[in-house]
Amino acid sequence: MEDYLVKSVAENGQFRAYAVNATALVEEAHQIHDTWSAASAALGRAMVGTLLLATSGLQGEAGMTVKIQGDGPVGFIVVDGTAQGTVKAYMQNPHVHLPLNAKGKIDVAGAVGKTGTLSVTKMAPGDKTPYTGEVNLVSGELGDDFTYYLAQSEQIPSAVGLSVFVQSDDHIEVAGGFLIQVLPGASDEAINHLETTLRELPLVSDLLREGKTPEQILETIFAGRDLKILEKMPVEYKCDCSKDRFEKALASLSKDDLQEMIDNDHGAEAVCRFCGHKYHFSEEELKYLVATK
């Protein structure tokens, strides 16, 4: 099944609802970063959560950076997402495998840690000062933490479900999630019914493994109730790095630092943390940067 996200309104405009299948892009992140099972699940959930936040809360060319800093063995996780449904990510320690938790599932909270922060920085073209909101982690499972962020930082009552199923060989079998936002004027009856449904809902990974599409996941949540699909959009892992961008970073270094690279290494190599692409700068290119200072 292809990776894509759907946007909808439900219960005659009482809820906004989003669902995404992100299996291929989470597998791509696994391939790029050589993530082990617990790290794959943590990184995958962070990427799916960022996709849902970015596509629901941004417009045009705007983007956001989500940083999760817990006290678990994976260290920090950084994810960039855009309104267009693209995402890229990296993490401090991708080689984390843990025993299964008490429910027999991958221990994402153990990998991320239960103490730490989740921050979201939003940037739009022309913005001089980006907006950043930050909350403490509440569980380290990440779905709860994104839900808490939306309630505390954006004052949007929401429910976020994130799920990644990792195979025994560390490949990603399925990955996806949903985001439901309660809109002003939603009735107590509708909210209570939704809460009951979500408590009984299977894991998103189980629904995806059954072959359910993002539309069918939302139909399962709002079974027998009004649901209007508004948009279907592709999502993908996409890095926008370039040699020009790394050259600007090198140009910001001091003359002494650049000269040291010339004298010791006769050049420089930059590696993108998001995609692993390597960019080589020759001795002549570095000398040009020194001469322009």
Curated annotation (Swiss-Prot):
Keywords: Chaperone, Cytoplasm, Disulfide bond, Redox-active center, Stress response, Zinc. GO terms for molecular function: protein folding chaperone; unfolded protein binding. GO terms for biological process: protein refolding. One of its GO terms (cellular component) is cytoplasm. Coiled coil: none annotated. Under oxidizing conditions two disulfide bonds are formed involving the reactive cysteines. Under reducing conditions zinc is bound to the reactive cysteines and the protein is inactive. It comes from the Bacteria. HAMAP family: HslO. PANTHER family: 33 KDA CHAPERONIN (PTHR30111:SF1). Redox regulated molecular chaperone. Protects both thermally unfolding and oxidatively damaged proteins from irreversible aggregation. Plays an important role in the bacterial defense system toward oxidative stress. This is 33 kDa chaperonin. The gene is hslO.
